[in-house]
Design a protein with these regions (language model features):
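Conserved N-terminal helical subregion
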Residues: 1-3, 20-22, 45-142
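Conserved SAM/SAH-binding loop-helix junction
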Residues: 14
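Beta1/beta-strand and adjacent pyrophosphate-binding region of the FAD-binding site
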Residues: 1-11
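Adenine-nucleotide cofactor-binding loop residues
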Residues: 11, 32, 126
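Glycine-rich FAD pyrophosphate-binding loop
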Residues: 6, 20-40
Length: 142
């Protein structure tokens, strides 16, 4: 089956990964001209960690992540007001925890499927029309 996924963030490439394994032809479409950089730091643990491990990506995600040792609360003046040692998270998750930039997670998943999917950057899905033989997808730029 041919499948179009709109968005190359985290969910789009992750879905593309599993659909490709299932034998589907995947087209990823991203409005940005390239993979996005930056973004916020996410705490990576629990089911997301388990899935990345199943995908064979957890080593790279941990390498790119920050092994945070302390969480600090600071005032407007920049002085520490409180905080705690985050080793409690390590104990609670059996050391299956890292903090990693969102764009690094996205890029790691995308690299795992690059060459196995078709990716279009700088465009987005404009519409879809059901046809007798399937769906017709139109794009903003193409």
């Amino acid at each position: 089956m041919k499948i179009v996924i709109n968005g190359i963030g985290i969910a789009g490439p992750a879905l593309g990964y599993w659909l490709t394994i299932a034998g589907h032809a995947v087209l990823l479409v991203e409005e940005a001209p390239r993979l996005r950089a930056g973004g916020y730091i996410i705490d990576f643990w629990g089911i997301g960690y388990d899935i990345a491990e199943e995908m064979g990506l957890i080593g790279e995600i941990r390498r790119l992540g920050y092994q945070v040792r302390e969480l600090r609360f600071v005032g407007r003046d920049g002085r520490k007001r409180g905080g705690f040692d985050v080793t409690v998270f390590g104990r609670m998750t059996h050391d299956r925890f890292t903090s990693v930039p969102r764009s690094d997670v996205s890029a790691t998943i995308y690299r795992a499927i690059e060459g196995k999917v078709v990716a279009i950057f700088g465009d987005s899905v404009a519409g879809m029309d059901e046809q007798e033989q399937g769906w017709r997808v139109t794009f903003d730029q193409a």
